[in-house]
Amino acid sequence: TKYSASISDGERIPEFVDRAFKIALSGYPGPVHLSIPVDIMFSSFDESAGLNERPFVRRQKHAARSWPCPEDLKRILDLLMQSKRPVLIAGHGVWWSGTEKQLEAVGHKLKIPIFNIPYHQKLLGEESEVYMGLADIHQYAPSKYALQQADVALMVGGRLDNQMNFGNPPFFPDSLQLACINGSPEELEYNRAADHTLLSDPGAFFQALMEAHAEREILFDSNWFDENKNQRGLWVAQMQHDAEKEAEGSSKLHPLKLALDVQAAMGPDDWLVIDGGNTHFWTEIAINMAGW
């Protein structure tokens, strides 16, 4: 848990609940725990108890945002100025900060291929020009190609956990520089394996990238971006061909076709939740094919 406390004074219940709520949703969101002893739980307290002696804002406020240290930010920007083949892997921190549109704008303006971590919420629509699929080198060959050919990988709002091979090869080859940008110190601590780290709200970092681009300090050749789109197109065509070939002369329903049919029936307000074994395996492939 991010925060745990035992309430020893019933008049302070609103204070503890308010603090726990804000801690749970700030920085790197996570669970909190409050214990209320039985004697307090079954007691009564005035609704306005504690308002005068411990005043605090009770309404919900926007979570505090981390702004990057100028020197640390400059090191990341200098790294990108030298890069020819960057990739960006976006994680749940982008979702929590509500900066998906800024993420997409960065991809459009700077021509950076964008991959989504292979779990948590989807950040960009499948139809987005800059979205290249999930960052999964085992099930999605285009992401493997991108990471093997890249010279810089930016992970924004994500963790170097088991799905990212803890920042090690073969997921992140030794040939590239890995930079992690996170909005809270505790999450940044998970990414100690990165070559470079930056404490920054994702939106603040995206803003800095756009400003650097506007000043023509960061400019990337579109050939790298186009090659990643080409790799995705070739992979989708191959998967469709393989599924159709396996289905020929068989009365059985191919699991990939099932996954694609489920997606085809979904609308913009529908949610797709997947987990477990073959269901996850084939549905993840279908997700990477969607929107092409």
Whereabouts are the PLM-identified features?
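Gly-rich Lys/Arg/Thr-decorated short loops/hinges at beta-loop-alpha junctions or inter-strand turns
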Residues: 1-2, 49-61, 125-126, 233-246, ...
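Active-site glycine- and acidic-residue-rich loops that bind
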Residues: 13-15, 92-99, 160, 251-255
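Anionic-ligand anchoring segments at beta-strand to alpha-helix junctions in alpha/beta enzyme folds, i.e.
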Residues: 68-69, 80-153, 265-292
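Glycine-rich, acidic loop regions that bind phosphate or pyrophosphate groups
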Residues: 1-16, 36-38, 120-228
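Short, solvent-exposed amphipathic alpha-helical segments in soluble enzyme
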Residues: 18-23, 49-51, 100-111, 168-173, ...
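Active-site diphosphate/adenylate-binding microenvironment
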Residues: 230-292
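Conformationally flexible catalytic loops at phosphate/diphosphate-handling active centers
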Residues: 19, 23-82
